[in-house]
Curated annotation (Swiss-Prot):
It holds the Pfam family PsbN. This is Protein PsbN. Coiled coil: none annotated. The keyword Disulfide bond does not apply. The gene is psbN. The keyword Lipoprotein does not apply. It comes from Pleurastrum terricola (Filamentous green alga).
Length: 44
């Protein structure tokens, strides 16, 4: 288990998990109040 491939795979997994968690936080957490909704702005 002390191979470079193991550490690289672990690093990529943690990176992917971090990016996913941050995007969920931005999309649904407190910062989501600052996001604009283009469908709400559009008048028919």
């Amino acid at each position: 288990m002390e191979t470079p491939a193991f550490f690289f795979t672990t690093f990529l997994g943690c990176l992917l998990l971090s990016i996913t968690g941050y995007s969920i936080y931005v999309g649904f957490g407190p910062p989501s109040k600052q996001l604009r909704d283009p469908f709400e702005e559009h008048e028919d």
